[in-house]
């Protein structure tokens, strides 16, 4: 199987995320998601940020460099993810950013050969140690946030009606 073919489950998951975005209204972006208190907008922007970060780590691995983040660097990532979502990122912008982030990841995978999938990669909080073994974590990450988003929107709509 070609490396880019391994993105099919991720692309299916992204299609679900995009369908959710299409069902949202502008006011839904301010709904608070249970858990860490982020809003729908912040969580969607987090998906964009995380995908760019993963793509960066994979590209470094393809160049023979394994990222090793210090505790301080990990904490900095956590702080930046907790920061307010970019001002002016409406539903259309978020959708566009998610599509572009996935296309960028796809381009990275198109550059790979089969043996590249076994290159070392490290990403904070994931036990995966190769590009190949990171793919299920990428899928689970977006899927779990999509569940949180759906629950928050459903809860909010029940309160309003």
Residues covered by each model-derived region:
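Alpha-helical bundle segments that constitute or directly flank the non-heme di-iron/ferroxidase center
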Residues: 1-28, 48, 52-60, 137-140
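Short hydrophobic/aromatic segments of transmembrane alpha-helices and their interfaces
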Residues: 12, 26, 99, 127-128
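A structural signal for long alpha-helical coiled-coils and helix-turn connectors
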Residues: 22-25, 62, 113, 153
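Acidic/histidine-rich alpha-helical segments that form the ligand environment
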Residues: 9-13, 78-118, 134-138
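Short, contiguous alpha-helical
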Residues: 30-77, 117-161
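A short, mixed-charge helix-start or loop-turn motif at secondary-structure junctions
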Residues: 1-3, 83-88, 127-131
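Alpha-helix N-cap/loop-to-helix boundary motif
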Residues: 2, 9, 35-39, 46-50, ...
């Amino acid at each position: 199987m070609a490396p880019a073919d391994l993105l099919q489950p991720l692309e299916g998951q992204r299609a679900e995320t995009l369908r959710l975005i299409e069902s949202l209204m502008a006011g839904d972006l301010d709904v608070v998601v249970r858990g860490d208190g982020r809003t729908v907008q912040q969580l969607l922007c987090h998906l964009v940020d995380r995908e760019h970060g993963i793509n960066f780590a994979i590209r470094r691995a393809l160049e023979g460099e394994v990222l090793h983040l210090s505790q301080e660097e990990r904490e900095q990532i956590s702080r930046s993810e907790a920061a307010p979502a970019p001002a002016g990122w409406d539903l259309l912008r978020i959708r566009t950013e998610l599509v572009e982030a996935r296309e960028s990841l796809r381009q990275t995978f198109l550059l790979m050969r089969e043996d590249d999938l076994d290159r070392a990669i490290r990403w904070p909080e994931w036990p995966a140690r190769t590009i190949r073994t990171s793919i299920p974590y990428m899928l689970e990450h977006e899927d779990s946030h999509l569940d949180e988003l759906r629950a928050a929107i459903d809860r909010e709509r029940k309160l309003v009606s």
